[in-house]
Curated annotation (Swiss-Prot):
Entry coiled-coil feature ranges: none
GO molecular function: ATP binding; ATP-dependent protein folding chaperone; unfolded protein binding
Region Disordered: start-end pairs: 605-626
Domain of life: Bacteria
Protein name: Chaperone protein DnaK
Induction description: By stress conditions e.g. heat shock.
Residues where Phosphothreonine is found: 198
First and last residue of the signal peptide: none
C-alpha cells in the first residue's frame, strides 16, 4: 500500500516525514538537510525552491517570494496584508476577487499556487527516498487558521498533485510526536508553538484507553500574525534606524539592501540564542554621491531581548485564555512542549517557564515535531497505525445573525470536530417568501462585530404568519475544520446549502482581535444582548396585541382601544432608543393597558390563544421549543431577475 506522508508547510521552513514500521523518518532533501526553506524564486524562466532560491535572493529580491503562508486565504484590504506590503521586496497585489496575490514578472499568482511549489518539493523529496510515487498526504496548519486558510491550503495540495487526506493543527501534530516516545499513562500537555509566522497554544489531554493512545484537544488559542518573521523585522528596523543615524540614509527604499539586511538579521538572531553578542557586518550595503557605505553594528543578546520583549509577552495572553477555556490552571499541566524555531530563543524559554512554573521539555525537535506528528496521522488514516485516536477542536464560535442583530452561536469554540449541529429558526414578517442566512465566525454577541463568512438565500417559503415557518439551519464541520452550511424549510423540504469558500475567510489579525475584543467588551456585549432581547419582546408583544385588538374589535370600548394604542405608540418610541429600563417600563405599561381587554376576551370564552401577548412572543408563535426568532433579509425575486 502506498504511504501517506506528513508535511509541515511552514512560514519559514517546511519539512516532510513518513512512518516506516513503528518509527517515523524525517526525510532529507536533495541538498541533504531535513528542513527546506519555504522560499520560491523565479529567475530566467526557471522556478527555484528552497535553498537554491534562498542563495540567490540578494541578487533577485523582487522575484524571490518568502513568508507566503502569511498571505494564504487573506483579502488584499486586510490590515495585516497592508502592513506586509511595506515589509517585503516583492509585489503584493489585489486579485479580481479581492484576495491578496503576488506579482512576478508582470504575472499575478495566488498564494496557494506558490505554496504548491513548496509542497511539490516535499512530494519529490519523499518520492526520491521511498522510490515510489506519492499522492496522499497529511498537511499541517496553525490551529488558529480560519476556514478560508484551511481551504486554501487544501487547494495548494491539489495544485501540487497531492490528495490531502487531512488538514491537522500544528500543535496537535506536535503532541502526537511527543506521545510516540512517552511513557504509558494519562497526562495533560501544553503545546507552545511559535513558528516563523504564527503562534498557537493548545492544551491536550493524552489518555490510555484500552491500549490505545487518545489525544483530545481541550482548547486552542493563538495569534496568526505573530512569529519569527516579526522578530526579524524588529531587528531589521533597529539596524535601519542605526544606519540612518550614522549615515543619514534610509535603506528601506532599496530592495537589494533590505534583502541583505533580512538575511543578516535572521543570522544574528540565531547566533544570539547561543552567544552573548554578534556583529552585523554588511560592506557596500549602498552608495551615494560620496561613495560606498558600509553597515557595521554590534548587537548584544540583551539588546535583541529589549527589541522583542513585547512580541514574547504577546504570546502569554493566548496561553491564559487556552488554560481558562480548558478549565485548568498552569499547575495542572504535566509537560510543556516547545515547537517552532523561534522557541530556541532563551527569552522565549524563560518566559514560558515563568508562566507555566516548569521547565519546558527539550527532547522534542522544534523544527521536526510537526512533520513527525503529521506522518503519524497519515499512518493512522492509511491503516498502518491503529493505536492512536485524535480528537481536535474548532477554534472559534460559528453562528448566524438573528433578530435584533444578535449573533446566535450554533457551534461554540473548542467544540470537537468533526461535528454537525442544527437549530430551528423562523421568519420575522407575515407571509415572508424568502430569507437570507448570514453566517458569522467570532466571539462577539453583536453579529456585525464578528466576521461575515458568507450568505445564501432560502426561497419559495409558503405564505404563513411570522414565526410559523420552521427553518432548520445546519452547520457541518469536517475533520479538516472546513464548513458546509445548509438551511431547510421543514414544511416543504426545500433546502439550500453553501460551502464557505476561500475568498470569504477571516484575516488572521481579525480572529485574534475577535477573541480579545470579546473578553475586553464582555460587559458591553451583555448590555447589547439584553437590549436586543427586550426590543424583540416589545416587537412581539405589539404584534400580538394588535392582532388581538382586531379579532375582538366588537368587545372593546373606544377608551380601552385608545389607551392600548397610546401605550403601543409609547413603546414603539422607547424601542428606538437605547434605554433598556425605559423599554421594560413601557412594556409593562402596555400589559397593564391591555389587561382589561384580555380579561374580557377570556371571559367571552375565546381562550388563552387570544391573550397570547401576555406570553413571550417567541413562545406564542413557535411550533418548536427550539425555534429562535430570526431577522432575515427579505429577498425580492423581481429584483433578482
Amino acid at each position: 500500500m502506498a504511504k501517506t506522508i506528513g508535511i509541515d508547510l511552514g512560514t519559514t521552513n517546511s519539512c516532510v516525514a513518513v512512518m516506516e514500521g513503528d518509527k517515523v523518518k524525517v526525510i532529507e532533501n536533495a541538498e541533504g538537510t531535513r528542513t527546506t526553506p519555504s522560499i520560491i524564486a523565479y529567475k530566467d524562466g526557471e522556478i527555484l525552491v528552497g535553498q537554491s532560491a534562498k542563495r540567490q535572493a540578494v541578487t533577485n529580491p523582487n522575484n524571490t517570494l518568502y513568508a507566503i503562508k502569511r498571505l494564504i486565504g487573506r483579502r488584499f484590504d486586510d490590515k495585516v496584508v497592508q502592513k506586509d506590503i511595506g515589509m517585503v521586496p516583492y509585489k503584493i497585489v489585489k486579485a479580481d476577487n479581492g484576495d491578496a496575490w503576488v506579482e512576478v514578472n508582470d504575472k499575478k499568482m495566488a498564494p496557494p499556487q506558490i505554496s504548491a511549489e513548496i509542497l511539490q518539493k516535499m512530494k519529490k523529496t519523499a518520492e526520491d527516498y521511498l522510490g515510489e510515487k506519492v499522492t496522499d498526504a497529511v498537511v499541517t496548519v496553525p490551529a488558529y487558521f480560519n476556514d478560508s486558510q484551511r481551504q486554501a491550503t487544501k487547494d495548494a495540495g491539489k495544485i501540487a498533485g497531492l490528495n490531502v487526506k487531512r488538514i491537522i493543527n500544528e500543535p496537535t501534530a506536535a503532541a502526537l510526536a511527543y506521545g510516540m516516545d512517552k511513557k504509558k499513562g494519562d497526562s495533560t500537555v501544553a503545546v507552545y508553538d511559535l513558528g516563523g509566522g504564527t503562534f498557537d497554544v493548545s492544551i491536550i489531554e493524552i489518555a490510555d484507553v484500552d491500549g490505545e493512545q487518545q489525544f483530545e484537544v481541550l482548547s486552542t488559542n493563538g495569534d496568526t500574525f505573530l512569529g519569527g518573521e516579526d522578530f526579524d523585522l524588529a531587528l531589521i528596523d533597529y539596524l535601519v534606524e542605526e544606519f540612518k543615524k550614522e549615515q543619514n540614509f534610509n535603506l528601506k527604499g532599496d530592495p537589494l539592501a533590505m534583502q541583505r539586511l533580512k538575511e543578516a538579521a535572521e543570522k544574528a538572531k540565531i547566533e544570539l540564542s547561543s552567544a552573548q553578542s554578534t556583529e552585523v557586518n554588511l560592506p557596500y550595503i549602498t552608495a551615494d554621491a560620496s561613495g560606498p557605505k558600509h553597515l557595521v553594528v554590534t548587537i548584544s543578546r540583551s539588546k535583541l531581548e529589549a527589541l522583542t520583549e513585547a512580541l514574547v509577552k504577546r504570546t502569554i495572553d493566548p496561553c491564559k485564555v487556552a488554560l481558562e477555556d480548558a478549565g485548568l490552571k498552569a499547575s495542572d499541566i504535566d509537560d510543556v512542549i516547545l515547537v517552532g524555531g523561534q522557541t530556541r530563543m532563551p527569552l522565549v524559554q524563560k518566559t514560558v517557564e515563568e508562566f507555566f512554573g516548569q521547565e519546558p521539555r527539550k527532547d522534542v525537535n522544534p523544527d521536526e515535531a510537526v512533520a513527525v506528528g503529521a506522518a503519524i496521522q497519515g499512518a493512522v488514516l492509511s491503516g498502518d497505525k491503529t493505536d492512536v485516536l485524535l480528537l481536535d477542536v474548532t477554534p472559534l464560535t460559528l453562528g448566524i445573525e438573528t433578530m435584533g442583530g444578535v449573533m446566535t452561536g450554533i457551534i461554540e469554540k473548542n467544540t470537537m470536530i468533526p461535528t454537525k449541529k442544527s437549530q430551528v429558526f423562523s421568519t420575522a414578517e407575515d407571509n415572508q417568501p424568502a430569507v437570507t442566512i448570514k453566517v458569522f465566525q467570532g466571539e462577539r454577541k453583536v453579529a456585525a462585530q464578528n466576521k461575515l463568512l458568507g450568505e445564501f438565500n432560502l426561497t419559495d417559503i409558503p405564505p404563513a404568519p411570522r414565526g410559523m415557518p420552521q427553518i432548520e439551519v445546519t452547520f457541518d464541520i469536517n475533520a479538516d475544520g472546513i464548513m458546509n452550511i445548509s438551511a431547510k424549510d421543514k414544511g416543504t423540504g426545500k433546502e439550500q446549502s453553501i460551502q464557505i469558500k476561500a475568498d470569504s475567510g477571516l484575516s488572521d489579525e481579525e480572529i485574534e482581535q475577535m477573541v480579545r475584543d470579546a473578553e475586553a467588551n464582555a460587559a458591553e456585549d451583555e448590555k447589547f444582548a439584553a437590549l436586543a432581547q427586550v426590543r424583540n419582546e416589545a416587537d412581539g408583544r405589539i404584534h400580538a396585541i394588535q392582532k388581538a385588538l382586531k379579532d375582538a374589535e366588537d368587545k372593546v370600548t373606544e377608551e380601552e382601544k385608545s389607551s392600548v394604542e397610546t401605550a403601543i405608540s409609547d413603546l414603539e418610541l422607547a424601542a428606538k432608543e437605547d434605554d433598556h429600563d425605559d423599554i421594560k417600563a413601557k412594556l409593562e405599561a402596555l400589559d397593564n393597558a391591555f389587561l382589561p381587554i384580555s380579561q374580557k376576551i377570556y371571559a367571552a370564552g375565546q381562550g388563552a390563544e387570544g391573550a397570547a401577548p401576555q406570553a413571550d412572543a417567541t413562545e406564542a408563535n413557535a411550533a418548536d421549543d427550539d425555534v429562535v426568532d430570526a431577522e432575515f433579509t427579505e429577498v425580492n425575486e423581481d429584483d433578482k431577475k
